[in-house]
Amino acid sequence: MLLCIDTGNTNTVFSVWDGEKFVGLWRISTDHRRTADEYFVWLSTLISLQKLELNIDACIISSTAPRVVFNLRVLCNRYFDTRPLVVGKPDCLLPVAPRVDFGTVVGPDRLVNTWGAFERHGPDLIVVDFGTATTFDVVDTDGAYVGGVIAPGVNLSLEALHMGAASLPHVDVTMPAKVIGTNTVACIQSGIFWGYIGLVQGVVDKIRLERGRPMKVIATGGLAPLFDQGFDLFDAIEDDLTMHGLRLIHDYNKEMGNG
């Protein structure tokens, strides 16, 4: 079985695959102080509660939080007796290399999402990921990542507004009943919701114009469904896009005799 691990700035997600069959997914908050032993106890407990067997013989990691990777490597080495692939490291091969400026480091999650989306939806894509940052990734005709856009994430924007303006409360984002708010909470919710609708529409339109061709828009991330309420922003929403991409990259490395 394959263990896929995706570490973001907010959450770390684990999934297990038996070949191409998805077995399960579990999520924990990202904490660089968490040890390999703690990860194992947590993961093995959840897996046993679902009456699954922990027969892991391969691991792959994608991480935007470098301080966490060390303990995840130890987890894979100590408890599963395997050397994990780490996306973005020289020993982890990619099916198609990104085409960006020399010296540019592309977030591994963006590379993983690019290939996962290409495998499912074909060429000429814009992948919108609603994470800690809201990212737009452009996928070329051969599946290569060719650049994109990074904007503050929804929750990050809410937190910044609350922290930067003492009189403004922290609110949950939701689709407001109308654009013009008649109280502070409604005004903030409207600004965030309609602001991000406009952000997505505007950036997608400009990417399509710059590329000069039709492009499908694939959304992922926990907040993606919030912005898919009759606005025709997305051609598809993929909840498990990163995990799917990690499995594909692992399988590619295996085919190439690497891992």
UniProtKB/Swiss-Prot annotation:
It catalyses: (R)-pantothenate + ATP = (R)-4'-phosphopantothenate + ADP + H(+). InterPro entries: ATPase_NBD, Type_III_PanK. One of its GO terms (cellular component) is cytoplasm. The active site is at 109 (proton acceptor). Its cofactor is NH4(+); K(+). Catalyzes the phosphorylation of pantothenate (Pan), the first step in CoA biosynthesis. Homodimer. NCBIfam families: baf, PRK13318.1-2, PRK13321.1. This is Type III pantothenate kinase.
